[in-house]
C-alpha cells in the first residue's frame, strides 16, 4: 500500500535535530521520493534550500522483511542531489538502512554512510518517521489502529521519458511530490522540485516550488491510465503506475 511519512528527527552523532519539513512518498508499487527543504534556510542555504532530496523507482531499492516489524532497505538512488551537485564528502553507491516499527506507529530508520570513501570510516545516522494519512488535507497521524486510511489512497507515478531529463512524480492520496533534473548539468540550475496538496475545494496548493523549469512537471493527474503519456510544456511523461 502507499505511504506518506513525515520525518520527526534526524540524528548524526549525539545531538538529534530537525531543521526540515521532510516528507517521503512511497507508492503502492515501491517507487519513492523524499524532499527535505529547510524550514528556516540561512546563508548559503538560501540558494538551494534543501538538506537533501532523493528519488528512485522500485528497481533502485531492495527491501527484505526481517520479521518482528523490522525491514531492511538497500537504496541505489536514481536522483541523489548530493551526487548530482558533486558535493564534497558525499557517499556514493548503495545505502543500507534498517527500519523498525514502534508500538506507537512511528518508524525508526538507522544506517551508515561512507562520505570519505568505502574503505574509510563510516558515519552512522538515525531518523524517526511518522506515517500520516495521505487522503487527508491536514497532517493526520496514522496509528496501527487506522492504517486503512492510507491503504485506500490513490497511488499514481509518472516518469519523464525525454533524453535530456530525468524526472519522477509520485501522487499519494492528496499529496504530490516530484523532481525534474537536467542531465549533464550538475548545478542547482538543473534541479526542479514540487510539493502539491489537493485541497477539499478541489484546487491544488503549492507547498514547495523550486527551479526554473517546474512548469515542465505535470500538475494535473485526472483521466490517466498506466502506460499513457502526459505532456507538460513540451516534455513527455509516462504513467508507470496507476492505482485510483
From Swiss-Prot:
Its main location: cytoplasm. It is found in: Cytoplasm; Nucleus. GO terms for cellular component: cytosol; endoplasmic reticulum membrane; nucleus. InterPro entries: Hri1 (IPR031818), Hri1_N (IPR038744), Hri1_N_sf (IPR043047). Belongs to the HRI1 family. Pfam families: HRI1 (PF16815). Unknown. Non essential. The modification Phosphoserine is found at residue 143. GO terms for biological process: protein targeting to membrane. This is Protein HRI1. It comes from the Eukaryota. Coiled coil: none annotated. Disulfide bonds: none annotated. Present with 15400 molecules/cell in log phase SD medium. Keywords: Cytoplasm, Nucleus, Phosphoprotein. Interacts with HRR25. May interact with SEC72.
Amino acid at each position: 500500500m502507499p505511504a506518506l511519512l513525515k520525518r520527526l528527527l534526524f540524528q548524526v552523532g549525539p545531538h538529534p535535530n530537525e531543521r526540515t519539513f521532510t516528507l517521503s512518498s512511497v507508492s503502492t508499487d515501491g517507487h519513492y521520493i523524499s524532499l527535505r527543504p529547510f524550514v528556516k534556510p540561512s546563508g548559503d542555504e538560501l540558494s538551494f534550500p534543501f538538506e537533501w532530496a532523493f528519488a528512485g523507482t522500485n528497481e533502485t531499492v531492495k527491501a527484505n522483511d526481517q520479521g518482528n516489524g523490522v525491514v531492511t532497505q538497500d537504496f541505489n538512488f536514481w536522483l541523489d542531489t548530493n551526487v548530482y551537485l558533486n558535493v564534497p564528502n558525499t557517499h556514493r553507491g548503495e545505502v543500507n538502512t534498517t527500519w523498525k516499527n514502534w508500538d506507537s506507529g512511528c518508524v525508526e530508520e538507522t544506517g551508515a554512510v561512507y562520505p570519505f570513501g568505502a574503505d574509510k570510516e563510516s558515519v552512522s545516522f538515525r531518523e524517526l518517521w511518522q506515517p500520516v494519512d495521505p487522503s487527508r488535507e491536514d497532517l493526520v497521524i496514522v496509528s496501527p489502529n487506522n492504517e486503512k486510511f492510507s491503504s485506500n489512497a490513490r497511488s499514481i507515478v509518472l516518469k519523464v521519458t525525454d533524453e535530456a531529463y530525468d524526472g519522477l512524480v509520485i501522487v499519494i492520496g492528496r499529496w504530490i511530490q516530484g523532481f525534474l533534473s537536467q542531465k549533464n548539468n550538475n548545478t542547482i540550475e538543473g534541479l526542479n522540485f514540487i510539493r502539491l496538496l489537493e485541497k477539499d475545494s478541489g484546487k491544488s496548493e503549492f507547498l514547495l516550488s523550486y527551479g526554473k523549469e517546474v512548469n515542465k512537471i505535470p500538475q494535473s493527474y485526472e483521466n490517466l491510465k498506466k502506460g499513457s503519456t502526459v505532456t507538460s510544456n513540451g516534455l513527455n511523461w509516462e504513467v508507470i503506475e496507476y492505482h485510483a
